[in-house]
């Protein structure tokens, strides 16, 4: 399971001209689900995403996680993160989880975030989405479990 996390001043996701999720300061989480992923990996990745200390403390040092910083989370499914780009000029998506399994784990991940009392917004699984982001920093990290 892969999360590309970006520290955001604000972010939103729109599906068919409807804003489905919007946050102020916090994290935009692009989430990719791989074939071998399960709930245990989702739990571990959620723990890492929410605990990752990439927000500045009073001394300007990256020392706070999203909850300590008072931020929110916007989770957007992105199967392309599971692509194999090693060869050729076209990515292979054979490493990605089957759609039903990927959706179940995506929804599980989102629910785990919400259980941590963090405002968690979402896109719409498997939809064609427009994602807007003001990346603060820019600060972007690739987390994989």
From Swiss-Prot:
Superkingdom, taxonomy of origin: Bacteria
Listed InterPro entries: Daa-tRNA_deacyls_DTD, DTD-like_sf
Role of this protein: An aminoacyl-tRNA editing enzyme that deacylates mischarged D-aminoacyl-tRNAs. Also deacylates mischarged glycyl-tRNA(Ala), protecting cells against glycine mischarging by AlaRS. Acts via tRNA-based rather than protein-based catalysis; rejects L-amino acids rather than detecting D-amino acids in the active site. By recycling D-aminoacyl-tRNA to D-amino acids and free tRNA molecules, this enzyme counteracts the toxicity associated with the formation of D-aminoacyl-tRNA entities in vivo and helps enforce protein L-homochirality.
Alphabetic keyword roster: Cytoplasm, Hydrolase, RNA-binding, tRNA-binding
Motif window: Gly-cisPro motif, important for rejection of L-amino acids: 137-138
GO biological process, one term: D-amino acid catabolic process
Organism field: Salmonella paratyphi A (strain AKU_12601)
Secreted listed as a keyword: no
Comment field on protein domains: A Gly-cisPro motif from one monomer fits into the active site of the other monomer to allow specific chiral rejection of L-amino acids.
Location(s), subcellular: Cytoplasm
Gene Ontology molecular function, alphabetical: D-tyrosyl-tRNA(Tyr) deacylase activity; Gly-tRNA(Ala) deacylase activity; Ser(Gly)-tRNA(Ala) hydrolase activity; tRNA binding
One annotated Gene Ontology cellular component of this protein: cytoplasm
Major location (coarse): cytoplasm
Record-listed E.C. numbers: 3.1.1.96
Protein name: D-aminoacyl-tRNA deacylase
Catalytic activity: glycyl-tRNA(Ala) + H2O = tRNA(Ala) + glycine + H(+); a D-aminoacyl-tRNA + H2O = a tRNA + a D-alpha-amino acid + H(+)
Similarity field: Belongs to the DTD family.
Assembly description: Homodimer.
EC category name: hydrolase
Matches recorded under Gene3D superfamilies: D-tyrosyl-tRNA(Tyr) deacylase (3.50.80.10)
Record keyword Hydrolase present: yes
